[in-house]
Amino acid sequence: MITVYSNGTAMIQAYADYLNTNPYLSQWFFVDGPLITKPDRQNYAVSAGTAAAPLLCVRVAPFSTVLFGDPDAAAELLDFLLAEDYEISRFLTSETVGDAAVRYLWERHGLRYQEALGMDFMEAREITEPSCDAVSAPESEDLPEIIECLENFILDCGLEDSVDEASQRETLSDFRILRADGKIASMAKLARRDAPFDTITNVYTRPEYRGHGYARKVVNNLKNEIVSAGKIASLTVDKKNPVSNRLYESLGFQRLFAQGEYRRV
């Protein structure tokens, strides 16, 4: 059964227990859901399937639609979204749901989607090496350089996102940076969650400083901060990037599952 919600919070409340069965996969529902207050074809919260086996989706423009739940409900959900002209040019979900959706979109609707970015979700629960004193939080005057690094990070990852300068200014203290030659050589950001885990995001090293262990020090410092606070450190890494995978594994991160962003081609 299809249900269109008047706001994202209503969906979260209706399926809170279900979403909490996998807080890693469902985290974007708690981030994006409250932002949906006036739903339309670009910003929406919709569910399909049954109460026991639903497939939930939320979208906040300009970001990807996020899917979570039972792949057997993919046909019902996708038929509705397409028939009602909802924006679904790209979506983020587990590989299980993603593969089912891609297959159905092609076989039933002749629409070709492909996994544009495959990611491994990893977590770490222990401190494995000491923090580096050279890693620090940025100052307000570092914001332009951080914005520059974020824009380069988006290009490197092949994402279609844009940088919201106001948002980054508000969360500037959550970044950690490591300098070399008077500029930011490497950085990462702490995304705080109302959950047992926090996430390390936006890990970026300037090309001329790669291969020298800068990212390792920044990520390790953030991991240590998270673990010391009694939480689990989590991150996602491109499955096609073996260098980063080995780096995170050497810091004690373990792979839990795979997810991907799928785009229409």
What are these regions (language model features)?
Residues 1-27, 124-160:
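Short amphipathic alpha-helix that is part of the acyltransferase structural core
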Residues 3-4, 23, 30-84, 90, ...:
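Conserved donor-binding loop and adjoining core beta-sheet/short helix segment
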Residues 33-34, 60-61, 165-204:
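A conserved beta-strand-loop-helix scaffold within acyl/acetyltransferase catalytic domains
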Residues 61-132, 262:
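Acyl-donor-binding surface of acyltransferase catalytic domains
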Residues 72-79, 205, 211-227, 245-250:
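Conserved acetyl-CoA-binding loop-helix of GNAT-fold acetyltransferases
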Residues 92-98, 235-247, 261-265:
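Conserved beta-strand-loop-alpha-helix junction that forms the acyl-donor binding cleft
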Residues 101, 248, 253:
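Conserved active-site tyrosine of GNAT-family acetyltransferases
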Residues 187, 256-258:
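Residue-level detector of high-confidence beta-strand sites
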